[in-house]
């Protein structure tokens, strides 16, 4: 219960960002509070690399919400991640990362807005691949944020990087929605809904680079975040039939941040008696949560070609919804 309350308090931080960026009845409903110039609608392809370019690959992590909280969430294992490329031949550097286009809060929870006198749920949960021809050395610098890191993963050539660029642009097309939650029956084994976050992109980048020839040192520590829900198989429902219960649930979650700590805890506990829902690819699903209900993990990932020491994505029983 204590860990569940901590996770819900963490979610309430997301809620703060959600509610503060949407003015009441604003006709331009989904707007980025801060426009990321390095997150264009179409990712920068970086051009074509010479076949013999020597390029070092790095797995980069920095604490989430670092501008406000510094290292706080990094100490709890809460990170944003990206892949960095250092072209030793040309001296140029590149970053590839995936993010919520309208910020993480909107990728996690809806906004409740009034349309013609009726409350509606507005989701602004687009995901976007951000690619820039540089590496922000300050953001990923452990001398500035002690929990930040850049981990050398291996070296590739220009041909392999060109292949990766094609793959990452297809990833952007195939993953248009940011999904915060991994929805499991049993952690690491039975997965109903996979998340689509920065960590999923970096993990799949590492896997794809392995498939096109990078050789990993199996002693390299490769870890990532998971924000997990635990449930029996989610059941698809009709939105109109469940309208009232869906609104009660999301209103309760969105109100968590209001009031004193005691009131916040009271609101968290009040959610226990409500029906729980999740929104996946345009559909709502009813959840029957099971123990431990929800948690966050900073866990190992097995590198391609190495002995399993974390979640085995090749051999796991990934059930999914369909």
Curated annotation (Swiss-Prot):
One Pfam family recorded for the sequence: CLN5
Domain of life: Eukaryota
Signal recorded as keyword: yes
InterPro entries assigned: CLN5
Keywords annotated in UniProt: Glycoprotein, Signal
Residues listed as glycosylation sites in the UniProt record: 93, 106, 136, 157, 172, 217
Signal peptide from the UniProt entry: 1-20
The protein, known as: Ceroid-lipofuscinosis neuronal protein 5 homolog
Species of the source: Dictyostelium discoideum (Social amoeba)
Lineage: Eukaryota, Amoebozoa, Evosea, Eumycetozoa, Dictyostelia
Name of the gene: cln5
